[in-house]
Amino acid sequence: SGKEADVFVVRCGSEIRCAKVYKEAMKRSFKQAVTYQEGRKVRNSRRNRAMEKGSKYGRKQTEEIWQNAEVDALYKLAGAGVRVPTPYGCIDGVLLMELICDADGDVAPRLGDVTMSAEQAVEDHRLVMLYVVRMLCVGIVHGDLSEFNVLLDEQGPVIIDLPQAVNAAANNQAESMLSRDVNNMTNYYGQFAPELLGTRYAKEIWELYEAGKLDPDIELTGKFHEDEHSADVNAVLTEISAAIQEEEARLERMKPDEL
């Protein structure tokens, strides 16, 4: 069980798979869900307004989007070369997917439940940083990455739990979420390989992303040099003012046809 779902091992014909049963919003302990949903596109304007108002219909739509976000992310990340469970579909709040197993055929342990050598920690950390980069290359930040959301099978780390995954280009908190994800993983692996604790992968990755230089197979260094140039305060204030005016105009447009 987790903070947003209960997970079961189930039989599907001759196959053993994993069924993730999402909890209702009021029963989830996942904090600040609205922050994670920022930037998720909803093309239907009526649906979007209902979600913003929090009506019964709107809450139902929000739940569907929350659940479908994980399925969409799993397919997208698998295609990008990130190791994730294979999804088989999501119906009525139940996500059916591949069961990740260890070398003995048992359910693979969470990363937080294993110990490892310094050499293995460095190698697995390198792989996880590679997966973070590949996620970002397709516009996704995990948003809740830690040793509790990574499984370890005989081939290495497998990333799980993605309903809160955010759109890197559309979510204002994407950089801070990526930084937290990277630092969580670095601090964990740093218990076994202390040399990792002095690295600055989060800053390096985000700078490359913003510069349009991030590549799925890029060789990271873990180093980052701060820009010592002064910020253009007037430009920042102008952008803030424009954003406020845009939001006020949006709210004004909504008034005549509220649900």
Label each residue range with its predicted role:
Residues 1, 119, 127, 134-138, ...:
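Regulatory N- and C-terminal appendages and interdomain linkers associated
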Residues 13-24, 30, 101, 107-114, ...:
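Catalytic activation segment of kinase domains across protein kinase-like and atypical kinase folds
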